[in-house]
């Protein structure tokens, strides 16, 4: 919204009517305490994450370069509509179903091969489901679904999972589809 009041302690908020509207402006009373908490958390080694560049830039201007990193996020409305139409999932009976999703499952940058092999080694304690092209994973507890282009089918299958393992080291954006 272009407000720069945070730089000087949020004296008088010019955007109280922005959504959601605020009736009472207490930001100026709280900002010093919040900044102290941030400093204490940074001293403990906490890493701050922002979904947007401008928020990370503002944070880093106060607390130093690299103290806040960006993980972009978003909502895929088409996917949300599909999920809203799916029937409720019953609690898994028996072994947990774990999903691993990547465009190309062979690529270690997107899929931590060692981690997946360690999960496979759990044998009948889990059911491992892979979604993507070129799965190198085969075992009695692995179900390879392949690369699914039909979003409704993919979301229906993922909706049955108990957990998603996202082990990518090279993505700038999380798998919005699977969040």
Model-based region annotation:
Residues 155, 178-179:
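Short alpha-helical segment that forms part of, or immediately flanks, the ligand-binding pocket
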Residues 3-48:
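Membrane-proximal helix-turn-helix segments that form the acceptor-binding/catalytic region
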Residues 172-174:
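Short glycine/acidic-rich beta->alpha loop that forms part of the nucleotide-sugar donor binding site
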Residues 169:
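Aromatic "clamp/platform" in nucleotide-sugar-dependent glycosyltransferases that forms part
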Residues 156-161:
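Short alpha-helical donor nucleotide-sugar binding micro-motif in glycosyltransferases
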Residues 164-165:
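A short hydrophobic beta-strand element within the catalytic core of glycosyltransferases
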Residues 90-137:
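Conserved catalytic-core segment of nucleotide-activated headgroup transferases in glycan assembly
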Residues 54, 74:
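Carbohydrate-associated surface elements
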């Amino acid at each position: 919204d272009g407000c720069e009041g945070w730089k000087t302690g949020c004296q008088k908020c010019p955007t109280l009517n922005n959504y959601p509207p605020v009736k009472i402006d207490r930001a100026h009373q709280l900002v010093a305490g919040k900044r102290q908490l941030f400093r204490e958390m940074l001293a403990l080694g906490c890493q701050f994450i922002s979904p947007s560049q401008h928020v990370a830039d503002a944070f880093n201007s106060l607390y130093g370069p690299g103290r806040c990193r960006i993980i972009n996020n978003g909502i895929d409305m088409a996917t949300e509509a599909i999920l809203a139409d799916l029937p409720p999932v019953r609690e898994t009976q028996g072994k947990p179903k774990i999903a691993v999703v990547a465009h190309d499952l062979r690529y270690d940058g997107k899929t931590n091969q060692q981690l997946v092999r360690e999960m496979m080694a759990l044998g009948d304690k889990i059911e491992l489901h892979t979604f993507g092209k070129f799965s190198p994973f085969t075992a009695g507890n692995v179900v390879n679904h392949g690369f699914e282009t039909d979003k409704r089918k993919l979301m229906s299958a993922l909706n049955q999972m108990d957990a998603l393992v996202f082990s990518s080291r090279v993505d700038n954006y999380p798998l919005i589809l699977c969040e």
